[in-house]
């Protein structure tokens, strides 16, 4: 276990979260008050890209996804990329399951939290602060994973384009979502572009009054997948 555990250098007054899932006990830090993270964004910075700090919370979809990852029988040496890694929870789970994992987020604050949280759980982080509209990573992966990233319509095309460019020919993408407004349009567009969709897990979370789906996307034979999507 890495001894860097006090996290005094992290911004936004971090608090500790502890999870027990599938026989694993994990710890993570997150901002104590997400509203403070939101308030830290200046009007000028917001107007540049209308970025909101969704990364600052551990969402129910990610919790369901965490359990799924921890029990999945992965092959050895699989290479994974998590888009929108946020707090690094899913990346940590993949690393615990011996997957070679890259973690990517547009927020440098999220990347700091992800980096430290991965180390806290005894893993070696590979974190890149980048935008999925232009990743700048010349590498392809066996699996691309993400949770709670289709929260705006403008992300549908860039996310699909990013997955297409970063997946190996026989690679797959796993995305978890609480069936928000743009989830069905995302799935429809993915089908139009030739992705094959399969539901890995679907669950109603009564106490949260939401439905969570973990979706797998793989390539079909549609030639559209070799084209630029936006």
Predicted regions and their residues:
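S-adenosylmethionine-dependent methyltransferases
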Residues: 1-230
